[in-house]
Design a protein with these regions (language model features):
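Short alpha-helical patches at coil-to-helix transitions and adjacent helical residues
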Residues: 20, 24, 91, 155, ...
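N-terminal Rossmann-like or analogous alpha/beta NTP/dinucleotide-binding catalytic cores
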Residues: 2-139, 257, 296-298, 305-306
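Extreme N-terminus of proteins, especially the signal/transit-peptide cleavage junction
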Residues: 1-3, 346-347
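Internal, conserved structured core segments that host functional sites
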Residues: 111-115, 119-169, 173, 194-195
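Conserved nucleotide- and phosphate/pyrophosphate-binding catalytic cores
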Residues: 157, 163-353
């Protein structure tokens, strides 16, 4: 069996550092490992329209922004197929067939769906398309016969529901779909990066993000305004590192070599945490260090993005070529699904009498 990756993002805005540590950096690592036969990276515009139906121009504008972020982070179109979801109509048809295998009650129990509904204040006014998001995602994953899906922690319930659909389909219609496996970031701090305001999730809609494309001065301003331990009022006060966004970001981004370069008074992050916990280390000093760490990580990404911004026609070509490759792959799976459902009425031995 081929080893295949499928992953992607909704084009509702530029990508942020939560995307980077939660999934993007892992995609680049897996892409460059040479361990996978095919890699598909989807710009999920159709899914983005489920809660932006009245503002399609927002989705359209952000397709290029997301593509630029992908390329800037190191996604290589020679190794990975970058495509636009709506350019692969087979995904919509697969979604429709899978809907028959899932109950409304099951979708309502999906923790990701529940949290997204609450965050957007949908309640009873939830669009049907948004409600069916987990089923659409299952179509995306199975269409490319993905064996591996690198995701952030918040997407785990979606992948679990996809696996349920795969098992149900295969048990009813015969072995047809590939059962995907989840890959989470190895660094636990990367599972879910909090917002700079200390809220549980960094989110474009909450406005608490550091974007990959933010200029250095913007990143610095955001870092210096970050939420920390509210009880750490004076430098000499003992501070708390658990749940402290500044230290969570350092857990996610910091490398030992950054101490030698930016903060030689400490050997590693454990020493810095120890000092903060016993008192005598101010938030400003820690934030300044975090800002230098982020600049070391984001600076090269920002420069590559600026280079690609000068090559927008090439970015369009990459997306068009990738979408064509993706459609061919999805068409193969859809044909197998139709055959399993016995609805390929005019094909060979299955033709209507």
């Amino acid at each position: 069996m081929k080893k295949v990756i499928l992953t992607g993002d909704r084009p509702t805005g530029r990508l942020h550092v939560g995307h980077y540590v939660g999934s993007l950096s892992e995609r680049v690592r897996l892409q460059n490992s040479g361990d996978y036969d095919e890699i598909y990276i989807m710009i999920a515009d159709a899914q983005a329209l489920t809660d932006n139906a009245e503002h399609p121009e927002k989705v359209r504008q952000n397709i290029i922004q997301v593509a630029l972020d992908y390329l800037a982070c190191g996604i290589d179109p020679e190794k990975s197929t970058i495509f636009i979801q709506s350019m692969v109509p087979e995904l919509t048809e697969l979604t429709f067939y899978y809907m028959n295998l899932v109950t409304v009650a099951r979708v309502q129990r999906n923790p990701t769906v529940k949290s997204e509904i609450k965050m957007r204040n949908f309640e009873a006014s939830i669009p049907v398309g948004f409600f069916c998001y987990p089923i659409s995602q299952a179509a995306d994953i199975t269409a490319f016969r993905a064996t591996t899906v690198p995701v952030g922690e918040d997407q785990m319930p979606m992948i679990e529901q996809c696996k349920e659909i795969v098992h149900k389909f295969n048990s009813v219609y015969g072995e047809t779909l590939t059962d995907p496996q989840i890959v989470l970031p190895s660094n636990k701090a990367c599972l879910r990066l909090p917002g700079i305001d200390g809220k549980a999730k960094m989110s474009k809609s909450l406005g608490n993000c550091i974007y990959l494309s933010d200029e250095a001065d913007v990143v610095k301003k955001k870092v210096m305004s970050m939420f920390t331990d509210p009880n750490h009022l004076r430098v000499q006060d003992p501070g708390k590192v658990e749940g402290n966004p500044v230290f969570i970001y350092l857990d996610a981004f910091c490398k030992d070599e950054y101490f030698a370069e930016f903060l030689p008074d400490y050997q590693n992050l454990d020493e810095l945490k120890e000092h903060y916990q016993r008192g005598g280390l101010g938030d400003v000093k820690v934030k300044k260090f975090l800002n230098k760490v982020l600049e070391a990580e984001l600076g090269p990404i920002r420069e590559r993005r600026k280079m690609w911004e000068q090559r927008i026609p090439d970015v369009y070509d990459i997306l068009q070529a990738g979408s064509e490759v993706a459609e061919k792959k999805a068409a193969e799976t859809l044909n197998d699904v139709r055959e399993a459902l016995k609805i390929n009425y005019f094909d060979g031995d299955f033709a209507l009498n």
